[in-house]
């Protein structure tokens, strides 16, 4: 299996399976002499860690990260940084019923069609367990970016229930189990998702990621576009089925006058009157907040029987038991933040290499 790496100058390779002994990643291209320790990475992993509420999988994994290389006396050395998380709460027996049966909507059938073999235990390589290492890599990327770039994410929609942007409060995001920026929507989601969970079903969601402090000039025309790389990175997250930058698909309903981001010089500085573009024009950052949204589909592991087939071609029904996220979008918030951080770190280094600091 190829294509387990992404990035150019800041390059991340992840490895491991859901029910293997460990998962890990190698971060290459990190500049030397940056302060880094496990304590800098662990808080970001703790935000994604499973089993923290009844609305996520009850698999209990501490997700304790270990730095194996690339750091000496608390500083990066410029050599590859190897990170490891040991799996401790695998329960492979829960997947015995699907060893020969495909879950409709799950990647296991595509893996089997391509490779002729698949690890059915928890989804193997296609499991969202892999995203823990993206979050770890994202913590390293934040060190590269420094404190001047701030990346935040929030869940904006579960099913048909959307937040009210007039009530948006970033300070509320980490005070509830949903990363919800609208305090009034939290009890609505609790009741709704509680019913979904009790029914053994699942539901999709929309996540928004915003990066502030990104200077103008990151990204390159045509094939090195910042938004193109960001879309690829977010699309690579498990269960993601759609991406928007700025107004995204809503821009198709706007006139040229409505979609324009007016510009003025204020105290010798370029300012914008709106941000429909989401902080990117021509693939290059404008200095405005970088805004991206992505949609995740419902988890394919559900209790209700669904028509499927076996590896041998027999028509069957599949009902999936075990520990699963009723809404995988919740824990996708810190994953989306991490992917944004990795893309920005890569483009920061690429920009510096081409035009200097």
UniProtKB/Swiss-Prot annotation:
Pfam family, one: Chorismate_synt
Cofactor note (record): Reduced FMN (FMNH(2)).
Superkingdom to which the source organism belongs: Bacteria
Keyword annotations: Amino-acid biosynthesis, Aromatic amino acid biosynthesis, FAD, Flavoprotein, FMN, Lyase, NADP
GO-annotated biological processes: amino acid biosynthetic process; aromatic amino acid family biosynthetic process; chorismate biosynthetic process
Annotated positions binding NADP(+): 48
Binding site for FMN: 125-127, 238-239, 282, 297-301, 323
InterPro entries: Chorismate_synth, Chorismate_synth_AroC_sf, Chorismate_synthase_CS
Known pathway: Metabolic intermediate biosynthesis; chorismate biosynthesis; chorismate from D-erythrose 4-phosphate and phosphoenolpyruvate: step 7/7
GO terms under cellular component: cytosol
Task of the protein: This reaction introduces a second double bond into the aromatic ring system.
The name this protein goes by in its record: Chorismate synthase
Annotated organism of origin: Gluconacetobacter diazotrophicus (strain ATCC 49037 / DSM 5601 / CCUG 37298 / CIP 103539 / LMG 7603 / PAl5)
Encoding gene, per UniProt annotation: aroC
């Amino acid at each position: 299996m190829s294509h387990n790496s992404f990035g150019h100058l800041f390059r991340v390779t992840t490895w491991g399976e859901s029910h293997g002994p460990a998962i890990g990643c190698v971060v290459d291209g990190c500049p030397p002499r940056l302060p880094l320790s496990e304590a800098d990475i662990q808080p970001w992993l703790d935000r994604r860690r499973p089993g923290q509420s009844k609305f996520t999988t009850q698999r209990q994994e501490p997700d304790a990260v270990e730095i194996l290389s690339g750091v000496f006396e608390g500083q990066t050395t410029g050599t590859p940084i190897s990170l490891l998380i040991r799996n401790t709460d695998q329960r492979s027996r829960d997947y015995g019923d699907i060893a020969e049966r495909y879950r409709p909507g799950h990647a296991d059938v595509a893996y089997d069609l391509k490779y002729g073999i698949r690890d059915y235990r928890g989804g193997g390589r296609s499991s969202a367990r892999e995203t823990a290492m993206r979050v770890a890599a994202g913590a390293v990327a934040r060190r590269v970016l420094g404190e001047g770039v701030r990346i935040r994410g929030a869940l904006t929609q579960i099913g048909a229930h959307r937040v009210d942007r007039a009530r948006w409060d970033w300070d509320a995001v980490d005070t509830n189990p949903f990363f919800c920026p609208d305090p009034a929507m939290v009890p609505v989601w609790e009741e709704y998702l509680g019913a979904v969970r009790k029914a053994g079903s699942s539901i999709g969601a929309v996540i928004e990621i915003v990066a502030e402090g990104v200077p103008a000039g990151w990204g390159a025309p045509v094939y090195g576009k910042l938004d193109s790389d960001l879309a690829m990175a977010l699309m690579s997250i498990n269960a993601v089925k759609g991406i928007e930058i700025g107004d995204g698909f809503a821009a198709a309903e706007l006139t040229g006058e409505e979609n324009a981001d007016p510009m003025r010089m204020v105290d010798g500085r370029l300012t914008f009157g709106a941000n429909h573009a989401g902080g990117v024009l021509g693939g290059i950052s404008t200095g405005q907040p970088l805004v991206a949204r992505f949609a995740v589909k419902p988890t394919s592991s559900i209790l209700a029987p669904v028509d499927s087939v076996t590896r041998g071609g027999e028509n069957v029904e599949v009902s999936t038991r075990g520990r699963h996220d009723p809404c995988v979008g919740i824990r996708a918030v810190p994953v989306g933040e991490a992917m944004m951080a990795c893309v920005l770190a890569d483009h920061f280094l690429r920009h510096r290499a081409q035009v200097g600091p």
